[in-house]
């Protein structure tokens, strides 16, 4: 398995293989009708699924959501992965659906997430921070795949001025850059 450093290196390499315009148009899938559903591959781990969804929505290219992922459909090998959509809303994971909606809304609302440069600025253990920037607009995306809470303390002085205030677009508390370090719980 990859740690955050290996993951950051590999995702950056994938972007460098193709011309920029091609990378921005690539179809980004977590799963499809030809493979087990992602949620099944991670044994129903919804936190891993949420992180993968956030990554999919913030990585360059066009995110493609396989039907049912947004409500937590499971499915291993064929034909389980091609089960019909469960229209009975009582069977849906509404929290997961709201997560998908929030991530998609944030992506749609911020051009920088669709066409900005992709720069890993922190990768240690199972924690990763990506900088997306475009025409003076900069956004940080933090991923914590560890089981413990993370007090973010990362040097980002090369990208932001001291005193810069950050808003958490996914509903958490904001953060402030102090002495060249971003600190957030």
Where in the sequence are the language-model features?
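Carbohydrate-interacting/catalytic domains
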Residues: 44-49, 60-65, 69-185
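Alpha-amylase-like alpha-glycosidases and glucanotransferases acting on alpha-linked glucans and related
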Residues: 1-63, 113, 122-125
């Amino acid at each position: 398995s990859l740690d955050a450093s290996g993951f950051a290196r590999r995702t950056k390499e994938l972007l460098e293989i193709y011309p920029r315009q091609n990378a921005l148009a690539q179809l980004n899938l977590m799963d499809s009708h030809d493979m087990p559903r992602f949620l099944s591959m991670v044994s129903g781990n919804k936190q891993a699924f949420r992180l993968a969804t956030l990554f999919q929505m913030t990585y360059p290219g066009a995110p493609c959501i396989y039907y049912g992922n947004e409500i937590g459909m499971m499915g291993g090998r064929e034909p389980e992965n091609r089960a019909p959509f469960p229209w009975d809303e009582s069977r849906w994971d509404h929290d997961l659906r709201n997560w998908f909606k929030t991530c998609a809304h944030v992506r749609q609302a911020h051009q920088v997430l669709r066409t900005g440069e992709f720069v890993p600025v922190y990768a240690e253990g199972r924690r990763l921070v990506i900088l997306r920037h475009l025409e003076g607009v900069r956004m940080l995306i933090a991923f914590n795949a560890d089981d413990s809470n993370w007090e973010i303390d990362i040097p980002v002085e090369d990208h932001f001025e001291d005193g810069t205030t950050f808003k958490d677009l996914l509903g958490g508390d904001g953060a402030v850059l102090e002495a060249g370090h971003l600190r957030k719980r």
